[in-house]
Amino acid sequence: MEPKSTTPPPPPPPPVLGAPVPYPPAGAYPPPVGPYAHAPPLYAPPPPAAAAASAAATAASQQAAAAQLQNFWAEQYREIEHTTDFKNHNLPLARIKKIMKADEDVRMIAAEAPVVFARACEMFILELTHRGWAHAEENKRRTLQKSDIAAAIARTEVFDFLVDIVPRDEAKDAEAAAAVAAGIPHPAAGLPATDPMAYYYVQPQ
């Protein structure tokens, strides 16, 4: 007669609720290499939904900027049609006339020519400011900078003649992007600068 076994019977298997899936899913992240091959990842890549939401927000901001420009030009046309006072201007006519006379071929200038130039220059400055401000808002800044004007010029085909006058500082843009990635404040990236006088620096001529 054989002796009875004293080992308890194995417990029943747990109920199967679904297909077993490892967590995190296999292949979701590339396998780490180097001395920290067995360390868990600290940051997961952003989900595709976040990237799609960011792209949608960018497209919405661009559409809003385009709508603002359309409203701006419609308002300018209304102002021109209802203008009756041609004596008061935001830009000095004497300065404009002096610039016009810088051309040696110009001998005489009619009285209404500087008036038209003053209005055209004012509209040019306003449109360029609108486009630069749209770029500043895209970067979540409330201060219009030279880089915003340069970006507006680069984006607008009719402003191509200004590319050499206001070149875009690619090195500064790369420096700002690297600073943001490292979490370091940088004025060009819309973060508060460590130096409060950063915006008041004037490059020597």
Curated annotation (Swiss-Prot):
Gene Ontology biological-process annotations: regulation of transcription by RNA polymerase II
InterPro entries, per database record: Histone-fold, Histone_H2A/H2B/H3, Transcr_DNA_Rep_Reg
Gene3D superfamilies with a match to the protein in the record: Histone, subunit A (1.10.20.10)
Keyword set includes Transcription regulation: yes
GO cellular component, one term: nucleus
Top-level division of the source organism's lineage: Eukaryota
Region annotated Disordered, chain positions: 1-24
Keyword Repeat assigned: no
GO molecular function: DNA binding; DNA-binding transcription factor activity, RNA polymerase II-specific; protein heterodimerization activity
Keywords: Cytoplasm, DNA-binding, Nucleus, Transcription, Transcription regulation
UniProt cross-references to Pfam families, sorted A to Z: Histone (PF00125)
Cellular location(s): Nucleus; Cytoplasm
Subunit structure: Heterotrimeric transcription factor composed of three components, NF-YA, NF-YB and NF-YC. NF-YB and NF-YC must interact and dimerize for NF-YA association and DNA binding. Interacts with NFYB2. Interacts with NFYB8, NFYB10 and HD5/NFYB11.
Function field: Component of the NF-Y/HAP transcription factor complex.
Annotated family: Belongs to the NFYC/HAP5 subunit family.
Protein name: Nuclear transcription factor Y subunit C-6
